[in-house]
């Protein structure tokens, strides 16, 4: 595994993980735009991630797609690749790479907390771990999502005549906020900006 120009790259089989520029073969961990780009010859990813890419970039955003189920092994020469749930967003995956009895895991973006909008994180045994660390510092302590949603609902009840605007990424967090509201029996109408609405009303499956 090489790290060239801020990209993970397996040189002897010309395979990139989440490359930012068009490549011959790209394994995509999830559908967020900083990981999933258009223009690759061959994209390997979960079916949900491929669907998201097609919604965002069009059906011809790659020349070839290989959808993999979680736990399904895919081989390129003497390398074996298996995707496992990352718990980040719908279709997100960790990548297990096996060669000569060595197991390397690339996490991609991941979340270990429970989230009903995607398959939850699965711990994968490995010899080498390459991890995303967006919130890796100890100063990042995320509160319980249900407590935060309860704060929002209380505020709505207290301030009935005021509009409440919740900022969230269109893909992933917006769906999670809506799901958490419904879990807490908040059944009032929710208005969304165009981006989450376009994703929700598309052919994209609602669960992983």
Stretch-by-stretch model annotation:
Residues 191-208:
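Single conserved hydrophobic/aromatic residue that forms the stacking wall/gate
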Residues 2-10, 16-21, 25, 31-163, ...:
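His/Asp/Glu-rich metal-coordinating catalytic cores
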Residues 66-69, 189-193:
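Beta-strand->loop->alpha-helix junctions that form or flank phosphate-binding loops
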Residues 175-180:
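A short acidic (Asp/Glu
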């Amino acid at each position: 595994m090489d790290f060239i120009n801020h990209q993970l790259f397996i040189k002897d089989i010309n395979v990139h993980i989440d490359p930012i520029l068009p490549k011959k073969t790209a394994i995509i961990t999830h559908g967020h735009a900083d990981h999933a780009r258009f223009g690759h010859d061959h994209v390997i990813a979960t079916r949900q991630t491929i669907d998201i890419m097609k919604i965002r970039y069009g059906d011809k955003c790659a020349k070839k797609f290989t959808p993999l189920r979680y736990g399904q092994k895919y081989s390129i020469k003497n390398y074996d690749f298996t995707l496992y749930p990352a718990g980040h967003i719908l279709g997100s995956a960790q990548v297990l790479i096996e060669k000569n009895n060595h197991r390397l895991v690339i996490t991609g973006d991941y979340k270990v907390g429970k989230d009903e909008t995607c398959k939850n994180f699965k711990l994968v045994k490995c010899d080498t771990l390459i991890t995303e660390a967006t919130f890796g510092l100890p100063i990042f302590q995320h509160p319980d999502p249900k407590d935060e949603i309860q704060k929002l609902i209380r505020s709505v009840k207290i301030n009935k005549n005021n509009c409440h605007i919740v900022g969230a990424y269109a893909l992933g967090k917006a769906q999670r906020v809506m799901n958490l509201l419904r879990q807490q029996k908040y059944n009032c109408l929710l208005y969304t900006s165009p981006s989450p609405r376009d994703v929700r009303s598309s052919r994209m499956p609602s669960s992983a």
